[in-house]
């Protein structure tokens, strides 16, 4: 037997009918136990390498044990716990955290989000808006509805402030008791309209009360012309009719009506339109057929009044200049050794004061030449002395 076994090749079975029991190796079973206890997701161990020639009764018992072992291991494989999902990265992970999944350990992001939500809730409470804000884009979220509401509110407040300031300027509201307003130094930031400064514009009465002709009395013609022109200076219109005649005065009235219907005339600086009486007098001065002598006779009283007003203003300026000069002389201190300069200045000052006193005394003052006449229009001109 030993020889036959030695003559046989490796892996070859003998032809003998003797029962031969092959004992299986213990290594596969031990490995199966180790793997089965260490990992729940393991494959069942197959015994295809073990050959066992036993009796039928023993074989049936072994098969029952193998089936029960197979079922137990299969049940263990089906009851394995679910695999843990990998840690999410990027925006998808943030979405799962927001949707109730695993929380992301982002402390500062949560703090910033809470602050933004508090600020938005405050704005919504102030503005009375309703609705939820879509924060799916988080820091890139832009609430355009809220921005539009804020811009509209800001523009309305700015418009109200402008309207309020404009109303104050238009009505000329001033604080009572202010020193600047009492002294006449206070001024409005915005110039008042012409109607507030000059009243409603005087409109010409084109129809009049009755018709006038060349044969009518000069007083009647002058009164009707003054009424149609709405001119308060009736004496001036009467002198125009008396010097130029009824015909020329009526022609000027017709030209004035035509100019007024076409829009009127501006004054010299263009700040406002002339009144109908101003248009009438302007046409009178610019008519070639009317001589300068006639114009002087018509405006003699007005020119005389204007001259008197200028004369009174000049006298007031001269008196103010004399007071300033006296105050300046009292404040000066001359050196004792400089007798010449003191005497010269005193003599010149006395002459100047004497001339001022003469100018203040009577109306019969002599007219100075153009070279000798010095007119002081402002108190700052004292610096030249």
Curated annotation (Swiss-Prot):
One of its GO terms (cellular component) is nucleus. It is found in: Nucleus; Nucleus, Nucleoplasm; Nucleus, Cajal body; Cytoplasm. Keywords: Acetylation, Cytoplasm, Nucleus, Phosphoprotein, Protein transport, RNA-binding, Transport. Residues 1-18 have a biased composition (Acidic residues). The modification N-acetylalanine is found at residue 2. The keyword RNA-binding applies. The modification Phosphoserine is found at residues 14, 16, 56-57, 60, 63, 347. GO terms for biological process: protein transport; RNA stabilization; snRNA export from nucleus. It comes from the Eukaryota. Residues 164-184, 364-385 have a biased composition (Basic and acidic residues). A motif (Nuclear export signal) lies at residues 120-129. Residues 270-278 are annotated as: Necessary for poly U RNA-binding and snRNA export. Residues 2-320 are annotated as: Necessary for interaction with CBP80. GO terms for molecular function: mRNA cap binding complex binding; RNA binding; toxic substance binding. Found in a U snRNA export complex with PHAX/RNUXA, NCBP1/CBP80, NCBP2/CBP20, RAN, XPO1 and m7G-capped RNA. Part of a precomplex with PHAX/RNUXA, NCBP1/CBP80, NCBP2/CBP20 and m7G-capped RNA. Interacts with NCBP1/CBP80. Found in a complex with snoRNA. Interacts with NCBP2/CBP20. Interacts with DDX39A; this interaction stimulates PHAX RNA binding activity. A phosphoprotein adapter involved in the XPO1-mediated U snRNA export from the nucleus. Bridge components required for U snRNA export, the cap binding complex (CBC)-bound snRNA on the one hand and the GTPase Ran in its active GTP-bound form together with the export receptor XPO1 on the other. Its phosphorylation in the nucleus is required for U snRNA export complex assembly and export, while its dephosphorylation in the cytoplasm causes export complex disassembly. It is recycled back to the nucleus via the importin alpha/beta heterodimeric import receptor. This is Phosphorylated adapter RNA export protein. It comes from Mus musculus (Mouse).
